[in-house]
């Protein structure tokens, strides 16, 4: 359908797609950067800490990305209702999405807890690494319900063309993650020593030394990440409650019990998306476990590569999410030819960005390796 529209239409739709996808992309990169920061700072604590975080993060990321795909079913549903002018339906679906995220998060948390002992037994590593792995995975599991509720709120806001607040909240979460990582990985005393080295205010240094926070090593990265997940969820929920532009949808103006028919509809649409996300994510995350027997150096190196690939993956993922919203909105307005056209524009944009990413990786591969 690309040939049925003028170049001006293509330019217009590309602008609309990029206006929606770029904030999504930047926000997703900030989220992935939290994992990169965890990796880097855990490595500063020691090779064993980095290995434990790499193994735990690979398990958590695989499940989280899979469930994130299931939650992505909310985007076309809400966008289509928005396009059809269903103000009440949009708010109700948003509330049902929060319930769905909570229930899916509790299920995922139970799965992660159940996997800890079998995966510990599988690892042929030191008892210290096994213990840190178990503690890290158990702690980040507590943040999974918050992370999936956040995905429901994310889908609601982005489907209503409000991706910018999500982007700023994600970057605020990243900035919060850095000092929290210092605090929990190196302890209050270690963080105070760092603050003293950078000539921070004496009052701040004295306050840090009084905090009863021990150095948790790599496990501390899990504590910081869990706190950041809950922070992001409450921050986005507060924005949605206060936003004047979104007030007409009534998202926070009433309480809804779980509607099992709606829950089933979300799951029916989302399981295939989740499966595709799982297959894509596991191509990278499972490699950490396949090479675990080779030792800590190989695991640490793979985690660095995984962090970079995760950042790159956010580019097409953001284009796809933005296209889903645009197409769903067009379908809601019964503009089926326009919906097909938007899908074509999205594919072309994806090809171009993919080619640019490939060239950038080839040109800058050595500097990127040196940074790692």
Regions found by a protein language model. Give the residues of each.
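Alpha-helical transmembrane segments of multi-pass membrane proteins
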Residues: 127-153, 308-310
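Interhelical loop/hinge segments that connect adjacent transmembrane helices in multipass membrane
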Residues: 1-19, 198-209, 218, 225, ...
